[in-house]
Amino acid sequence: MFMIIGLQVGFSSNSEEGKKEIADTIFVNGKVYTVEKQQPWAEAVAISNGKIIYVGNNTCAKAYKGNKTKVIDLKGKMMLPGFIDNHLHASGTANLLFTVQLKGAQTLEEYVQRVKAYDEQHPGATVIQGHGWSNTIFPSASPNKAALDAVVNDIPVALRSEDFHSLWVNSKALEIAGITKDTPNPEGGVIERNQDGEPSGTLRETAQNLVLNTLPSFSVNEYKEALHYFQSFANKNGYTQVKHILVENQENIVQALTALEKEQALTIRHNLTFAIQPSEGESRIPYLKEQRNNLQGQLVKGNGAKLFMDGVM
């Protein structure tokens, strides 16, 4: 399958009347799926200055050829319009680059050993964060703080589940967050507890924020690096636009994206949706209006809000 990233898709008339714009690149002999009712399939595409100026047949595409035009023979391969992902957490790539990776481990022991190894490799760390544990590894119970306390008990450990809806923490993280047996469940969240009522070490949904809000956020530069990494992946897989769901560290993420836009380092469109926690309610509206007004660039736009009202199964 052959994919191309295009910034604008349109159809040019097949008429040869008038002067044609000269293309930088022309693709011919392809199976081009256009997603247009009047012409769902084509065999040629012409591009000039990063924009698609013609979609149609091989013969008419020749009218856009100049002395320096590059012609690429697709040899029957498929070409698709750019993909749009309407719900993702691209900034979460920072978790992939800068924290303990638990994905792929098959047992509790493997999880714990990865945390222990990270602690040994980062002797100056003030916190250990990680991502990727699966609820399926704990079929009869939730992750417990005791397993983490056995390897790291002097600094907080906070490990996100693979779906980002649960947080596994050690006793130090609970202590710093002030979570005790008397702490009530926050609206929209659950503090799981042992039989004696003490927090067990698993926080579900909005209860995660009780610990996450006490941890240092990724820096603007770390988010810039993470977004570069994400864009590289997106480009290779044919994505031209994404909708970010921003939950925590919104300011740093916005600063990273706007800085990259000013540096002309963005290669896809980024639409931003800001999450609102149940406890925030209408107090968040002025902030959302401000972001909508400020974020109206060519490649970065603030145009949505996410109301968090449920959980996952």
Residue spans of the language-model regions?
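Bacterial N-terminal signal peptides
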Residues: 1-8
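Divalent metal-binding segments
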Residues: 11, 18-28, 33, 37-287, ...
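Accessory "access/gating" subregions that flank catalytic or transport cores
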Residues: 293-296
